[in-house]
């Protein structure tokens, strides 16, 4: 049997379990800025060393990249940014890839390429917009439009279509609401 999203969840659960065991030992200690940066770099470097970026843009991978972008904003480490760019390029700056809006779905739960309107496939747009904004700040907005083309297409469709229950589960508030707020600046 191949790799499943549940394998990733097991890894994440194990990391949290180990971290929670270490928490009481470190709770009494005051951490300074350098120690926090060192820990962030250590954890993020471990992740990037042990997980290839060429994976799908579904939530189980995309959530990491939203965090990696925040680390990049803080540290400006090009290696971290390059890792996420490789992931975005691997996914052609897209979430679910069905081209025909008449076939787009959001219910019931689904991981298929036709679940374009399902937030688990839209969280990737947060990162694509961040990457686009980095290029736009360099004066490359027009040349970088491909980075947000799919996000604009999908979210415009969602914003102006009739259903009002696209965010029918709580995770969508983390996955999709930031996409909508980031799109405001595009």
Per-range role (PLM):
Residues 28-186:
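Glycan-recognition and catalytic cores of secretory/periplasmic carbohydrate-active enzymes
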Residues 1-31:
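Bacterial Sec-dependent N-terminal signal peptides
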């Amino acid at each position: 049997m191949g790799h499943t999203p549940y394998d990733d969840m097991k890894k994440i659960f194990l990391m949290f379990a180990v971290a929670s065991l270490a928490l009481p030992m470190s709770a009494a200690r005051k951490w300074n800025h350098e120690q926090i940066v060192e820990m962030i770099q250590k954890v993020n470097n471990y992740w990037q060393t042990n997980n290839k970026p060429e994976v799908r843009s579904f939530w189980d991978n995309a959530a990491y990249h939203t965090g990696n972008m925040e680390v990049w904003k803080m540290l400006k480490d090009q290696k971290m940014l390059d890792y996420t760019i490789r992931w975005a390029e691997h996914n052609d700056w897209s979430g679910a890839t069905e081209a025909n809006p008449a076939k787009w779905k959001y219910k019931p739960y689904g991981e298929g390429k036709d679940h374009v309107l399902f937030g688990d496939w839209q969280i990737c747009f947060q990162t694509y917009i961040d990457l686009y904004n980095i290029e736009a700040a360099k004066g490359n907005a027009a040349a970088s439009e491909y980075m947000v083309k799919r996000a604009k297409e999908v979210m415009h469709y969602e914003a102006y279509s009739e259903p009002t229950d696209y965010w029918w589960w709580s995770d969508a508030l983390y996955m999709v609401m930031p996409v909508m707020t980031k799109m405001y600046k595009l």
